Amino acid sequence: MRKKIISMLFCVVLLFSGLLAGCTAGEQNTNTGTFVLGKAPKYVFMLIGDGMSAVQINAAQVLNGNNTLGEISTNNLLFASFPACGMATTHDSTSFCPDSASTATAMSTGYKTHSGVIGMAVDKSTPVTNIAELLKAEGMKIGIISTVTINHATPAAYYAHVASRSDYYGIAMQMAESGFDFFAGGEISK
């Protein structure tokens, strides 16, 4: 199970790490880098395009494409040329239209749960261990950064276990008790 979670994390990091670079204008990056087998990475970043699917990727390709009469084409994003790509089924245990709580729980733990539930099994009372907790237990430093509030469902799925994504107090208390090394979040404008 741990190998499945680490493999899933690697694929997600690989897929989304190019999103920011692929969406920027400018010269193409020609740095191919190197990968050394057996050597552990110093840093691992997981970037989540919350709500992003093939439709949003295509919209970015169209936006960055060519709309000259007779020469219409899309512009491929950098991550679209990666040698490996992954796609995930995003329905949760109760809905074909899931929310951020259940999908982030699935990404962080490998378990599907109910919409609105963070870090708990289908019974809504059994906490399930997430990848950040596993890595912290291995002695790695953990930082969680978000453009939304840090107690939002997506970042919270990497440190909290609550039956309701609206339990902001419980989420905040678990953040403080997590022992993680760094947290930073944005705010939601209304």
Question: What kind of region is each of these model predictions?
Answer:
Residues 20-22:
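C-terminal motif of bacterial Sec signal peptides marking the signal peptidase cleavage site
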Residues 27-189:
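N-terminal catalytic scaffold of extracellular/periplasmic and nuclease hydrolases
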Residues 1-9:
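Bacterial N-terminal signal peptides that target proteins for export
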Residues 10, 14-18:
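Hydrophobic core
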